[in-house]
Amino acid sequence: MMMDEFMDLRPVKYTEHKTVIRKYTKKSSMERKTSVRDSARLVRVSMTDRDATDSSSDEEEFLFPRRRVKRLINEIRVEPSSSSTGDVSASPTKDRKRINVDSTVQKPSVSGQNQKKYRGVRQRPWGKWAAEIRDPEQRRRIWLGTFATAEEAAIVYDNAAIKLRGPDALTNFTVQPEPEPVQEQEQEPESNMSVSISESMDDSQHLSSPTSVLNYQTYVSEEPIDSLIKPVKQEFLEPEQEPISWHLGEGNTNTNDDSFPLDITFLDNYFNESLPDISIFDQPMSPIQPTENDFFNDLMLFDSNAEEYYSSEIKEIGSSFNDLDDSLISDLLLV
C-alpha cells in the first residue's frame, strides 16, 4: 500500500512517438471513378507504455526517479499509385512542402536564358548582372560592379578593357573610332602688294599711246567703244591755238579783226606790193673762158687737180661737224 502511494508521487514525463508507413495499390476499373481521397485508407496502431525507461541506469541517478510514459503510434496509409491515377503527387502534405520550397527559390526568367553571353559578364542568382575584368599586370580580377541589364555591364567591360589593353583589346561591341574634328583653315587676306602687282601687269599689257591715257578704261565690256569714252573736262585740255592770220588791206577794220588798235597800218601797202619777176634764171649761163692775164688762174679754182684737193678738205670739215653734233646731242640728253 505504501509502495503504491510512493509511486504515484513521482513526477511523470509523457512522450509520443509516431511512425508513418505508406503503401501503394492499383485501383480497379470500378474504383478509378472515385476521387483520391475516397480511395485512400489509413491503418493506425497505438500502444502506451507506462513504465518505459530510456536506459537501465536511469533508476540509479536519483533517490526518487521520475516516471516515464511513452505512447507509440504506427500509421499505415494505403493510397493508389500515381501511374494508375495520373496524379503528380499522392500525398497532400508532401505537395504543400514542395510548393513552399519552390516559392522561396526564384527561377531565372526565360528571357535571360535566351540572352547573348557577353565577355566578362555573368548573372547573379537574384537577377542582377555583374562585370569584372582581369588585370594582366597585377594578375588579379578587378570588380566593375553590378548592373540591371547585361548590355550595360558589357559596355563597362569594354571601356575597362580598352584602358588596360589598348585599342586592340577584345570587346563585346565594335567600338568605332571617333572622327577627328576638322579644323577650318582661315583664309588669309590677300596682300595689297599682290593686287597691285597683278594690276600693274594687266596695265602693262593694255598700255596705249600717251594721247589715249585719259580715255583708258580698266575693264572690258560688251558696250560699244563710243559709249565707254566719256567726255573729258575742258579744264584738263590745253586750249587750242588759233592760227595767226594776217589781215592785209588798206586800213579797213572789221568786227572780227584780232589786231590791236595801235598797230601801224602803213605797212599793209608795203607787203601788198608784188616783187618783179627775176629773169636771170630764165636765160642760159654762158661758160666762163679763162684768159692768159686772168687773176683767178693763180687761185687754182678752175684747175683739174683742184677737185681732189677740195674733196679731201670737205670730208675733214664734215667729220668735224659730225663730232660736234654728237657731243651736243649727248649734252642735251644729260640735261
Curated annotation (Swiss-Prot):
Belongs to the AP2/ERF transcription factor family. ERF subfamily. Component of the cytokinin signaling pathway involved in cotyledons, leaves, and embryos development. Probably acts as a transcriptional activator. Binds to the GCC-box pathogenesis-related promoter element. May be involved in the regulation of gene expression by stress factors and by components of stress signal transduction pathways. Residues 80-92, 101-115 have a biased composition (Polar residues). This is Ethylene-responsive transcription factor CRF4. It comes from Arabidopsis thaliana (Mouse-ear cress). PROSITE patterns: AP2_ERF (PS51032). The keyword Secreted does not apply. PANTHER family: ETHYLENE-RESPONSIVE TRANSCRIPTION FACTOR CRF3-RELATED, SHN SHINE , DNA BINDING / TRANSCRIPTION FACTOR. Residues 78-121, 175-209 are annotated as: Disordered. Pfam families: AP2.
